[in-house]
Amino acid sequence: MYVVNPQLVVLVDKDQEILDVLYLTLYDGIDERSSMYYFIKNHLRVPMDRVRVLKKHIILTLKISQVKGYICDLLNIDEEIIIYSHKNNLEYSYVDNTTFNPFTMTQRKTLLKSKSFLYNVYVDACNFLVIWVAKAADTMVKELGSYEEVDANVLKFESRLIEMFPDLDLDFTVESKFNNVFRTNLKMTGLKNIVLSNTDKKILFIKSDEYFINLSGNHFVINDESLNLSIWDDDGSLAISSDGNTITVNNVKLFTDMIPNNNVQMERIKSDITYKVKLSTPITSKVKLDIETSFIFIETATNNILLSVDKKISIILAKNHISIKVKNHIPNIEKYFTFLVVFINRLFNTVKQSMDFTKIETIYWSRICQNTKDKNRKPVIISSLEPDMLKVSDNFYKSPTKEVFVNNNEVMFTCDDKTGKYNNIGFLAIFYKLQKICIPCCFLKNQSHTDTFMACVHNKQTDKNIISPYILNYGKVVTDSKIAFLPPIFNDFFNSDLSISLESDNKRLKSTKGYHVIRSCLHNCRYYTLKRIRTKNDIIQFVNTENVTLIANDIVYFPMKYSSINNKIYILVQEIVHEIVIAKKEEDKDMIYFEELRTNKLRDMFPYKVKTVDIKEQNGLKLTTDGFYVDGELFTEPLSTKRSVFMDNISTQNNPIVKYFNSVFKYVVTDNKEIFIKTWVINTMLKLGIGKDYTHIQIKSILEKYYKL
């Protein structure tokens, strides 16, 4: 549980004698376990009965001028003041960063005035903020004093914060990831020693020039660097990377475990830190800020991304976590910003901590249940039942003209469409399926036959094996009891010789002897539903790791090897993997049956179909165009990190191997096609023993022997 630390304001006279001590806190009374209590008792040596305890809080995102205005108001001072600190520079600082004190000024150093923000100037503000105040006239440098008016919006914000603070859930956990770049003395020998010390991580050391490539490690991939060390984490992310002059460290623990000795010199060049904060209570990810909070955060064009007031810290909001990226380390700033986000989220969003939307009288319905010019779908709240209403269940009542649903908090909902069309109460199926929440909405037709209605009104759970005959249009995420049409281009491809019978006025399935449809992966491929496939990189990794055929945005993605393609075909809908199956239904029966695909009709589209040809075989070792085999088994063991491999470097310009495979390369999907082609050419040369001195005619003859396109 995060605790917002107390703050201290100390007013002194011309002799630096303490006149007033204000202990600012959002809790009740002085926390005797806090470092602030220890500071008052042992350093200020002020009796506790002289300390004024106020339910106040100096917001750390304020500019120094705003802080002065707040303090003038707090102390009821209407003359010029100077604020300073005993351990940090605040309003003023010397050029050599000596701590400024208005009572011990020196003319021999250049003085700088800060116009920045409190958390940037006072680096420990989140943990231990002590502001000393002196009237300018009482100091040696009264010309440095100023008076600032308090910002009324700051006081208004503080008032709401104090009022709502007891209800805030500040239970969260923080994970951090450092992205550090250092200048280092780890040259080629030092990097090689790291490779030699490696035991289990994916690692690559590469040195290349115009003529040769030297590789060592256990994960041989080519890159554009003349000298590079790369080490990957278990999840495939890059943990450490170095070019011999600088080193980027994304996993600090791994780096400290692998450095060969203590003589490594590290000079920080730049760093940023990403904090991932996991929340115990969900928030609303889309926040619309009031203009009165411009001193807290800055809105961006994307309403789930906020910026700090200095635009150096970015905050990404999600339902159950917050990501905070900072340029430089500020102690506990991620926790303080999370505290502000939780408060602002509660302040500006009606949907608060409860996941039951209907607990709140001012209801913000989903977009799929909202009023438009000609539709009134949002239910209204009423205070009582009409006399002619009959009880249908414990929470549902009905009359000839009206239906009423009563939620768990005894709030009554009914439909009141003036046109008389949308007067049938139903429930939003998506919310019930995902969260078991019954959220009413008004429908054109009677909903009493639907699964969600039966569950919400009669507490009858449906058989999950029963599939709804209504076929969704492509583009919607398919739940476990639904099916959907394929995109038009693929619907024509898969179902050109198949037939389907639908009811005339809707898309309800009457019968089919077999028709390709989209089904949720919750049945046969539940593991895939846990994956979010967002980027091209995600698609490439998924297809090649799982050896599957995937349709995404009208493009078919195959794994690298033709032999890896099986009969299963998957399709991406809103970043979620679904499967393609064959649906069957008899006209006189309700049950819909599914068959898995017996053949992969897309396999014939694969652009690179060549037979595996043996290149060389000896003593149980066999090299083929499809890989290297030991006693008939494909060799997949990681290479030794203690061995180096030398090979010729090549150019892809006017290369005969590139020209030969050009018809294949145009179908390749990758982030760096040039590196892919270069890797392909080098692998082909190594497999077939092709030297750099071979003529174009010789190379073409060899390729035609082993790779007949």
Swiss-Prot record:
Q: How does it assemble?
A: Heterodimer of a 70 kDa and a 82 kDa subunit. Part of the early transcription complex composed of ETF, RAP94, and the DNA-directed RNA polymerase.
Subcellular location field: Virion
Q: Which GO terms describe its biological process?
A: positive regulation of DNA-templated transcription
Where in the chain are disulfide-linked cysteines found? none
Record carries keyword Heme: no
**Can you name the source organism?**
Fowlpox virus (strain NVSL)
Tell whether DNA-binding is among the UniProt keywords. Answer: yes
Question: What gene name is listed for this protein?
Answer: VETFL
Cellular component annotations (GO), alphabetically ordered: virion component
Q: Per its database record, what is this protein's job?
A: Acts with RNA polymerase to initiate transcription from early gene promoters. Is recruited by the RPO-associated protein of 94 kDa (RAP94) to form the early transcription complex, which also contains the core RNA polymerase. ETF heterodimer binds to early gene promoters.
Among the GO molecular function terms of this UniProt record, one is: DNA binding
Name of this chain's protein: Early transcription factor 82 kDa subunit
The UniProt entry's sequence similarity note says: Belongs to the poxviridae VETF large subunit family.
Q: What keywords are annotated for this sequence in UniProt? A: Activator, DNA-binding, Transcription, Transcription regulation, Virion
